[in-house]
Amino acid sequence: PLEGGGSVEFQGEAADFAALHRRLGGVQMVLQDSQAALNPRMTVREAVEEPMRLSGCFQDGAAERALEDVGLFACDSFLTRHIHALSGGQRQRVAIARALTMEPALLIADEPTSMLDPSGKANLLRMLKGLQNNRGFSMLFITHDLDSALKISDRLFRLEKGALTRLNPNDYIQVRFDGLFDAG
């Protein structure tokens, strides 16, 4: 139960997120700040394989496949690089690859483009939508950026003052005009 009422269900059952992120086909999350989300002393291989090792779901080759799916060449010289030596865009892709190794049914992406330049943002949005189409997972894309939301989303919802409202396409112009998605 949620404060004020309501509940969260996943695949028809009460959601236990402590368990769901530890199993294949569960829920994975990509955070806004990949620098804080990834251990800077780990290598790329260690960071991407960590969720599988912690959950006991290790699969040979899963890290390499996930890295290639996000556009990172999984050669030995890249796999042995430390997280702190990567660019912001590379770190965000490693964070996404890390989530993909667990073959999520639901990927929660919390402001994944906020720390990227416009080109990096556009590339990441295209990549995420392509991954969603190819791998078949659902995605909850959390953002203040209406343009990004319009590019990647099949359905839009607005959370305002604790109320969740589904927007229909006719609402998008009004939302943009009202500035409801401005972070300021």
Residue ranges and their predicted role:
Residues H82-L86, Q90:
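Conserved ABC ATPase signature
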Residues L159, A163-A183:
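Conserved beta-strand-loop-alpha-helix hinge in the C-terminal portion
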Residues D33, M42-L54:
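Q-loop/switch helix immediately C-terminal to the Walker
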Residues D60-S77:
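Conserved ABC ATPase "signature" region
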Residues L107-D110:
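Catalytic Walker B motif of ABC-type/P-loop ATPase nucleotide-binding domains
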Residues L2-E3, E13-Q28, M42, L54:
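ABC ATPase NBD coupling module
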Residues E103:
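Conserved catalytic motifs of ABC-family nucleotide-binding domains
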